[in-house]
Design a protein with these regions (language model features):
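All-alpha amphipathic helical-bundle segments outside canonical DNA-binding/catalytic cores
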Residues: 8-16, 71-82
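GST-like domain detector, emphasizing the conserved glutathione-binding G-site
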Residues: 1-48
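Surface-exposed helix-capping loop/turn segments at secondary-structure junctions
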Residues: 2, 67-77, 120-126
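C-terminal end-helix/capping segment
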Residues: 104-125
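Alpha-helical transition-metal enzyme core signature, strongest for iron centers
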Residues: 21-28, 55-58, 93
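Short helix-capping/linker segments at secondary-structure and domain boundaries
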Residues: 29, 40-43, 93-102
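Amphipathic alpha-helical packing segments from all-alpha helical-bundle domains
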Residues: 50-68
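GST superfamily/GST-like fold recognition
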Residues: 74-98, 116
């Protein structure tokens, strides 16, 4: 019911969660773009300025989100869709580019993601495949 909704139905709370989701989705889009470029295109034709710009956008996005926490969760005292989405995206980034993600220094995101990953719903959906080799993406 509404008391368990992950996105408030209206008002400032809804706008806050939607804003956090938008930044998380935009950040993840850049993570996927860089991974795609580095995984599927020959290294000699990578467009390095574009990759560097994407990495900067990923860094800025995650750091902005890390600074956006308003308590235990991103939007305050209750877990929202923004928290779940960010935890999943953080896990994907760590699986595909662990060295890059470690250098970001986003301790609040890492802590929140770690807490969520320990819950039964997250444990039930753990990936079975091995992560991509990090040397392919660094």
């Amino acid at each position: 019911g509404p008391d368990q909704a992950l996105v408030p139905p209206s008002g400032d709370g809804r706008r806050k969660v939607m804003r956090l989701l938008a930044v998380a989705l935009g950040t993840m889009d850049k993570v996927v773009a860089v991974n795609y470029e580095r995984r599927f295109r020959p290294k000699e034709i990578w467009h390095r300025p574009w990759l560097e710009q994407c990495d900067k956008q990923v860094t800025d996005g995650y750091r902005w989100l890390d600074n956006a926490f308003e308590g235990e969760w991103l939007a305050g005292t209750n877990m929202t869709q923004a928290d779940i989405t960010l935890a999943v995206f953080w896990d994907f980034g760590r699986a595909t580019r662990p060295n890059f993600m470690d250098r970001l220094g986003c301790g609040r995101i890492a802590e929140m993601a770690h807490l969520l990953e320990a819950t039964a719903p997250f444990q039930a959906t753990q990936r079975e495949a091995e992560p991509l080799p990090s040397n392919a993406l660094e």
